[in-house]
Amino acid sequence: MQKIKTNRSAAKRFKRTKSGKFVYSKSHGSHILTKKNRKRKRSLRKSHILDSSNNKELKRLLPGM
């Protein structure tokens, strides 16, 4: 039987917390920042918790986490 592979694109985008929730960072926060206002850039800095409806699919993509 083969080993279950981790989906590398998902592994780079999500981290798992101790409680089992998944944390990710929002996109559009790395460049072309001059036209984005201060409030938007500040909110892009924070990490966000993934909605629980997507947890089952992400657990399938990340079996080792």
Curated annotation (Swiss-Prot):
GO biological process: translation
UniProt GO molecular function: structural constituent of ribosome
Bias (Basic and acidic residues) ranges: 54-65
Pfam family, one: Ribosomal_L35p
Family under the similarity heading: Belongs to the bacterial ribosomal protein bL35 family.
Sequence ranges of Basic residues compositional bias: 10-19, 33-47
Gene name of the record: rpmI
SUPFAM superfamilies documented for this protein: L35p-like (SSF143034)
Residues spanning the membrane: none
Keyword Ribosomal protein: yes
Name of the protein described by the UniProt record: Large ribosomal subunit protein bL35
Entry keywords, A to Z: Ribonucleoprotein, Ribosomal protein
Region (Disordered), start-end ranges: 1-65
Signal peptide: none
PROSITE patterns: RIBOSOMAL_L35 (PS00936)
GO cellular component, one term: large ribosomal subunit
Ribonucleoprotein as UniProt keyword: yes
